[in-house]
Amino acid sequence: MKYHKDIFEIIFYARGGQGAKAAAEIIAQAAVAEGKFVQAFPQFGPERSGAPTKTFVRISEKAIRTYEPVIDPDVVVVLDETILDSEVVTKNLDSQEALIVNTKKTIHEIQQKLAEHGARFEGKIYPIDANGISMEIVGQPRPNTVILGKFVQVTEAVSLASVIAEFKHIFEDKIGKEANDKNILAIEKAYDSI
C-alpha cells in the first residue's frame, strides 16, 4: 500500500492502557527519522483504563497544516476487537484503504461483525493475532508492539528498520535489553506474517 494522498493518515482504536499512544509515537518518530513530517496525538476523555480511545497519526513529505482529528484515514488499526461492537471503525475508509485488526477472527468473520453494525468495507482487511504473538514471545499482552510489524508490512509508510530503531531508542532503557529484544522479535514476527 502506497500513499495515495499528500498526507498519509492513520487512526488507532484501542482501550486505555493498550499502548495505542506509544505505537503512534513509535511510528511518528520512525517517520521523522526518515525525514518526513508527522503529527501524532490521542483523543480520549477523563475515562479510566479500559475505556475506548482514538489516536491519530499523519505522515507527509510536506509540512502538515491541519490540526483536526483524522476523519479520512488511509489505515485504521484496531488493537481491541471488542471495539468493533461499539464503533464504526470503517467510516470514511474506501476500497483503496486498509483495516488492521488484532483478532483471531478470519477476514470473513470481521466482515460479518462489521455488517452487524451496518458497516460495509470493501478495502483490505488484515487480521493478526497480536495478543497471541505477544504472549508467545514477550509473555505479556502487548498488542501495540506486535501491530507495529503488521502496520509496516501493510503500509510501507515507514521502514521496519526505522520502527525497530525507534522502539529500541524509546524503550530499551525503560524495559531492559532482554524485554526490548523480545518485543523487537514480536514486531519482526508480525512483519513476516501472512
Residue ranges of predicted features:
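Active-site cofactor/cluster-binding pocket
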Residues: 1-194
